[in-house]
């Protein structure tokens, strides 16, 4: 703390995920839920090391306002991935406001850039899972960019606004809204991704021994992707620009929940319950048909839907200040409508 209103922070973190799962060799397997392949296939135990370090500087403008800026660098080393090493630079800015004793508002902006270490880029790592080699001999068939969107070069911008309100002693209200944009520098696979989300949570304590709470939120995503249809003739992949196609992704996620917590026996027995419902919808709108426009308009994939109901109850009893037991029960009901999975039947040779 070099000055009364200025604070400096530094942080560093090391995390290693060591995957000790043995490598397995499958002499035959069912491909695409349709046919039996006798070409050997090996599993690739994925593991990584993540290192990060950064600094943050904060300054109190006035007692009701504080601003801060930060920088974080994150490096990841991976095993069994096309991108064995990548680094990401993350820049952030935050403004905290407290216009009244019952209002807290935070606005933030984050810009990050992830870059691949080109010296440690192996686009054909996937061949390691085929000890005998892949059946298709044309290297262009792999379109490895489709397999690395989560680790390849990416630029991200994110803005977020959160607030915490306590208009009266018995009520707390939290609100947030966020938007981010991802831009991937690849010719195929995921190109761009946009996401807009918001959420509200409310907590109400009508009496000291009872608390009621609820929340609602929604996220809407939109993306662009490029791919290529790659037919196989005589065990050789056919690669042509005329077979490129593009698609637009649309995703919507909704979440609702409510519950309660009650002190049945003050400082001894507590009982709570809650219910949550989640709903999501996914669309893939094709905008270009393989083979060129002469083949006609592209056909979009059917929508995909997911629903999750979750009901829970918790009961805890405290014997002493340091000893307690807790019992929980959860019931979940999951429903999905997925055109790619619904008609699949068990394979028989």
Where do the model's predicted regions map?
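Gram-negative and organellar
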Residues: 1-349
